Amino acid sequence: MEIRAEEISEIIRKQIKEYGKEVEVAETGTIISVGDGIARIHGLDKAMAGELLEFPGGVSGMVLNLEEDNVGAAILGEDNENIKEGTTVKRTGRIVEVPVGEALIGRVVNAIGQPIDGKGPINTTTFGKVEVKAPGIVKRKSVHQPMQTGLKAIDSMVPIGRGQRELIIGDRQTGKTAVAIDTIINQKGGDLICIYVAIGQKRSTVAQVVSKLQEYGAMDYTIVVSASASEPAPLQFIAPYTGVTMGEYFRDNGKHALIIYDDLSKQAVAYRQLSLLLRRPPGREAYPGDVFYLHSRLLERAAKLSDDCGAGSLTALPIIETQAGDVSAYIPTNVISITDGQIYLESDLFYSGVRPAINVGLSVSRVGGSAQVKAMKQVAGTLRLNLAQYREMAAFAQFGSDLDKATQMQLARGERLVEILKQPQYRPIPNEKQVLVIFAANNGFVDEYPVSSLRRYESELYSFFDSRKADILAELRDKKAIDDDLKAKMIAALEELKKEFTA
């Protein structure tokens, strides 16, 4: 084979022409200790707080502590054999981001937005920063649109508005998750996108919730973020921020979203674990000093935006689990002071058959009243007072049997109101039907029936109005208020039902 000098020189010239001078510069550090989801890294002098790090084996990490001679980072994933002392960690120069957008709807993802439902990758090119500043005062608008839960006791006495933060608090096994799931199911056919964040729960429980949501067609507008009990503390800590980042995408694009954190006590425990491993000084109940900020910066991101900012909203329903009804513990008092009200669920009520087990005296909605539908405001105005008086009288009535007629009537009415406000799980009720049944109870239409027949009366009332008085339901739905004319129609219809219903 003949070697041609001109050919060789041509190839060399071409190579020189195409030679790229780019040099890849990476800032790296060395792991000096690792364990329990925490790595200490030497050599990352320019790392930022909250920065994303690249660990060996494709695992990510997040910078939490910036110290004089090392950096403390949380490993966002399972500790694997590739992450050990002496291995190299790279800086990315980016803050932790998660995928956001419409493509996530109907999916179940982990704490960093990766799909775990076996339905393939999520096709989205949009990412959102996990840590961002909450909207300022100028960007906000006061809460004025209702967010219906479909639960009579809540929509009538503890109304929630779009953009509000309403805490659901109670002991374990009092129906906190049930209230949240019913609220999601009630949004079917509406314009709310729901995000359910499961923190520190059993995988079987999360699977059960997802199957219930699928059964009622609610996964069509729901995203589930799961950081189960078996996952490392850093993932349980970051999951709520991942969820709120996904919700903010809809809020900032003029849409309406609802996010449920189930539950924040477990997130606080995970954060306590992280902080103690990072050797941060412990405070009350061994929680770090910034545990209030942990929840306040999360919940402040739920807001109703002003018209100039697109008028979107993000409503938050955080859940907190109490120990033996102790609402004055550290985390419960923190979250109560951050939120715009709380729904307090009581185990005594739950076991006595009052479900949802809402304690009306301790539950309050600080801003929801201005968002409540006017018709509901008209019928439920005295409901809370009547129930509070009934509870007080019932306590005294235990001591004496000879009660006057007025007291007996008030006790009978109260008993019926409590019965009417009971509701089975997974059966949210539209607002106009709630108004009707509370109107009937308030105006004495159920006084003569025994308490045991009220559940049947309620279902017959709904079917009677659905089949024969649909115009009244439509008028209630459209007007959202009760005028004299509509009131007369409602009374006439209820009188007609009274003749037909036999207890």
From Swiss-Prot:
Keywords assigned by UniProt, alphabetized: ATP synthesis, ATP-binding, Cell inner membrane, Cell membrane, CF(1), Hydrogen ion transport, Ion transport, Membrane, Nucleotide-binding, Translocase, Transport
Alphabetical GO biological process terms: proton motive force-driven ATP synthesis
Enzyme Commission no: 7.1.2.2
Residues binding ATP: 170-177
InterPro entries, sorted: ATP_synth_asu-like_sf, ATP_synth_asu_C, ATP_synth_asu_C_sf, ATP_synth_F1_a_nt-bd_dom, ATP_synth_F1_asu, ATPase_a/bsu_AS, ATPase_F1/V1/A1_a/bsu_N, ATPase_F1/V1/A1_a/bsu_N_sf
Topology of the protein relative to the lipid bilayer: Peripheral membrane protein
Residues at the site labelled Required for activity: 363
The keyword Transport is assigned to this record: yes
Xref: CDD domains: ATP-synt_F1_alpha_C (cd18113), ATP-synt_F1_alpha_N (cd18116), F1-ATPase_alpha_CD (cd01132)
GO CC annotation, single: plasma membrane
Compartments where located: Cell inner membrane
Role noted for this protein: Produces ATP from ADP in the presence of a proton gradient across the membrane. The alpha chain is a regulatory subunit.
Subunit structure: F-type ATPases have 2 components, CF(1) - the catalytic core - and CF(0) - the membrane proton channel. CF(1) has five subunits: alpha(3), beta(3), gamma(1), delta(1), epsilon(1). CF(0) has three main subunits: a(1), b(2) and c(9-12). The alpha and beta chains form an alternating ring which encloses part of the gamma chain. CF(1) is attached to CF(0) by a central stalk formed by the gamma and epsilon chains, while a peripheral stalk is formed by the delta and b chains.
Protein name: ATP synthase subunit alpha
